[in-house]
């Protein structure tokens, strides 16, 4: 487990997206089409909508047609894809997982949040479909590296997290404020920092509120 800030690994985004490609796509290809209409943790979006957003974001990285990824602009991208056959949505996503990673890696950290967001959305999809390992699937350790980097960029309060696999520092030290402590499952850590619903019994946070940790 990464202890804190470290030199950026430009191969990490591609590695994380490849892991998600290899783990999530087989699940999606065996999922009955009606299940893609299930609601997710993303307000107003179905499983299909989340996947459409993921594919569109990766396509924008590949084409260089980036926008601010606000909720309004994301919804426009998703709405454009609601008329697509499901197979086309999944094809765009699969291609994006494999082609966007090196471009994100070469962007010097500016687009790392896209890679992390894609992996988190994979957790949203797994949770909605009742699949195991939601928010703790293959690539978890790489996702934690990006989570740490993003938490420092967003200047969330310093949190010393104790996880089943080791310890992790996130955020930055605030003047006059001691580090918060978090003991949680792997999935609860991601849920907290991504602003997803989390069972109170899955974590113990002292010295900060869940709302202060959200990085998206």
Question: Model-predicted segments: where are they?
Answer:
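Surface/interface-facing alpha-helical segments and adjacent flexible terminal/loop regions used
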Residues: 21, 44-47
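Structured surface interface patches that mediate subunit assembly and partner/cofactor docking
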Residues: 2-13, 37, 66-68, 105-216
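Hydrophobic, proline/glycine-rich low-complexity stretches
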Residues: 2-34
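Short, helix-capping/interhelical loops that line the mouth of catalytic, cofactor-
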Residues: 1-12, 55-107, 131-133
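Helix-loop segments that flank and shape redox-cofactor active sites
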Residues: 26-45, 67, 102-109
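Short, structural beta-strand-to-alpha-helix junction motif
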Residues: 46-47, 85, 185
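Short amphipathic alpha-helical segments enriched in hydrophobics
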Residues: 21, 28-35, 54, 58-65, ...
């Amino acid at each position: 487990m990464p202890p804190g800030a470290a030199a950026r690994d430009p191969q990490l985004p591609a590695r994380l997206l490849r892991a998600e490609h290899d783990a999530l796509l087989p699940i999606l290809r065996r999922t009955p089409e009606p299940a893609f209409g299930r609601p997710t943790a993303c307000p107003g979006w179905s499983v299909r909508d989340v996947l459409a957003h993921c594919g569109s974001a990766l396509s924008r990285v590949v084409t260089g047609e980036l926008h601010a990824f606000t909720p309004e602009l994301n919804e426009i991208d998703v709405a454009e894809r609601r008329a697509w056959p499901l197979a086309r949505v999944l094809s765009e996503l699969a291609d994006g997982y494999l082609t966007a990673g090196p471009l994100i890696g070469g962007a010097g950290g500016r687009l790392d949040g896209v890679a992390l967001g894609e992996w988190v959305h994979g957790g949203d999809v797994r949770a909605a479909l009742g699949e195991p390992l939601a928010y703790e699937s293959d690539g978890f350790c790489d996702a934690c590296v990006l989570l740490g980097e993003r938490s420092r960029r967003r200047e969330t309060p310093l949190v010393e997290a104790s996880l089943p696999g080791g310890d992790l520092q996130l955020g930055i030290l605030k003047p006059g404020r001691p580090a918060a402590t978090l003991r949680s499952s792997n999935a609860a850590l991601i849920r907290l920092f991504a602003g997803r619903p989390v069972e109170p019994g899955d974590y113990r946070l002292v010295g900060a509120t869940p709302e202060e940790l959200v990085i998206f």
